[in-house]
Amino acid sequence: MEHSRCLSCLILAALLSQVNPRALEVLEAEDKVILKCNSSITLLQGTAGQEVSDNKTLNLGKRIEDPRGMYQCGENAKSFTLQVYYRMCQNCVELDSATLAGLIITDIIATVLLALGVYCFAGHETGRFSRAADTQVLMGNDQLYQPLRERNDAQYSRLGDKWARNK
């Protein structure tokens, strides 16, 4: 449960230079965020909360609403400033070690099955002859060029019948 709380929200409490951590506290009660101070709390910027008791306790609202802002505890020269920033992860999935191991093992099995399928279908072609049988002799008798044939059977060969052809 503690891990899910750490993963579900991010609290950034940056105390400025003269801050006493005991003077201003951030409490999480159920699903609400509450600020407690020894003296009065003043909102500098951000989410305006509801005062709970005599301006020493401030309810910032629900954690799911991402309360954030700068708050000042005290009004004199010894005032403390606190910055609160909540960010709830609403679409997150808790990822523990068993889930991560399951994902990795499933990925490895799927990859092996895919490689096995490719090997079975593409690796063995039956009825295939050797490479020597694939080669054809295009021109016999060591000829460099193939002699041209007469072309009287083509579509446009009848147009030039009036002129003599050089053979």
UniProtKB/Swiss-Prot annotation:
Post-translational modification: Phosphorylated on Tyr residues after T-cell receptor triggering by LCK in association with CD4/CD8.
Keyword set includes Nucleus: no
Pfam families on file: Ig_4, ITAM
Residues in compartment: Cytoplasmic: 122-167
InterPro entries named in the record: CD3_esu/gsu/dsu, Ig-like_dom_sf, Ig-like_fold, Ig_4, Phos_immunorcpt_sig_ITAM
One Gene Ontology CC term in the entry: external side of plasma membrane
Signal sequence range: 1-21
SMART domains: ITAM
Domain of life, source organism: Eukaryota
TM helices/strands, residue ranges: 101-121
Primary location class: membrane
GO biological process, one term: adaptive immune response
Modified residues (Phosphotyrosine): Y145, Y156
Topological type in the membrane: Single-pass type I membrane protein
Keywords on record: Adaptive immunity, Cell membrane, Disulfide bond, Glycoprotein, Immunity, Membrane, Phosphoprotein, Receptor, Signal, Transmembrane, Transmembrane helix
GO MF term (any one): transmembrane signaling receptor activity
Residues bearing carbohydrate: N38, N55
Subcellular location: Cell membrane
Disulfide bonds: C37-C73
Described function: Part of the TCR-CD3 complex present on T-lymphocyte cell surface that plays an essential role in adaptive immune response. When antigen presenting cells (APCs) activate T-cell receptor (TCR), TCR-mediated signals are transmitted across the cell membrane by the CD3 chains CD3D, CD3E, CD3G and CD3Z. All CD3 chains contain immunoreceptor tyrosine-based activation motifs (ITAMs) in their cytoplasmic domain. Upon TCR engagement, these motifs become phosphorylated by Src family protein tyrosine kinases LCK and FYN, resulting in the activation of downstream signaling pathways.
Subunit organization: The TCR-CD3 complex is composed of a CD3D/CD3E and a CD3G/CD3E heterodimers that preferentially associate with TCRalpha and TCRbeta, respectively, to form TCRalpha/CD3E/CD3G and TCRbeta/CD3G/CD3E trimers. In turn, the hexamer interacts with CD3Z homodimer to form the TCR-CD3 complex. Alternatively, TCRalpha and TCRbeta can be replaced by TCRgamma and TCRdelta. Interacts with coreceptors CD4 and CD8.
Name of the protein in its database record: T-cell surface glycoprotein CD3 delta chain
Name of encoding gene: CD3D
